[in-house]
Regions:
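Glycine-rich phosphate-binding loops that contact phosphosugars or nucleotide phosphates
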Residues: 1-110
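Active-site phosphate/pyrophosphate-binding segments
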Residues: 81-82, 98-177
């Protein structure tokens, strides 16, 4: 049943140094990279493949990570907000996990879930459009700050790191640490 399916969030840079005592050749790993070139992820994929771990990636199949895992193990990420943008990554990861549960007999309504969520991107775009005026206010207020600190915990920790490191630090060269 679903009680014996263990799920762990592992950061590639940490795993490259410390490993994970529960990872074996029977493990399945899902990673994501919009750029397809994240060095820590590439290093981890190499080590995991040596262990016989099955690695799947949400990335461009023609990028470095896509080539490392094999195109047949890739799902293209969507940079286009109309196609889901960042939220599509969450959706795809959820679908991956739910399909695993489905194949184990723990989520028999997987196909119904997929059918019911197929038009979610239009709604997400409408929500973004409604928030745009408030986003503009926040941007004007904080855009020129010398230093910005982002704090997240629990379920928001990973999203906080993603936003601050990938979007602000790597793409906009903002000092965030």
């Amino acid at each position: 049943g679903d009680r014996d399916l263990e799920v762990y969030l592992i950061h590639a840079a940490e795993w490259n140094v410390m490993g994970h005592k529960r990872m074996t050749e029977r493990s399945v790993v899902l990673t994501a990279s919009e750029s397809g070139t994240t060095p820590e992820v590439l290093e981890a994929i190499g080590k995991m493949k040596e262990m016989g771990v099955r690695v799947y990636a949400m990335t461009n199949p023609e990028g470095k990570i896509g080539r490392a895992v094999g195109a047949e193990n890739c799902v293209m990420m969507a940079s286009d907000h109309g196609a889901g943008g960042c939220e599509k990554g969450y959706y795809l990861a959820d679908c991956f996990g739910l399909r695993l549960l489905n194949r184990r007999g723990c989520f028999p309504k997987f196909d119904l879930f997929i059918e019911q969520t197929k038009d979610i991107w239009k709604d997400m775009l409408d929500i973004r459009k409604r928030f745009e005026p408030r986003a503009g206010e926040l941007a004007r207020k904080y855009a020129l700050a010398d230093y910005t600190m982002f704090i997240g915990s629990g379920a928001l920790w990973g999203e906080t790191v993603l936003y601050s490191m990938c979007l602000l630090e790597e793409m906009q060269w903002k000092r965030i640490r």
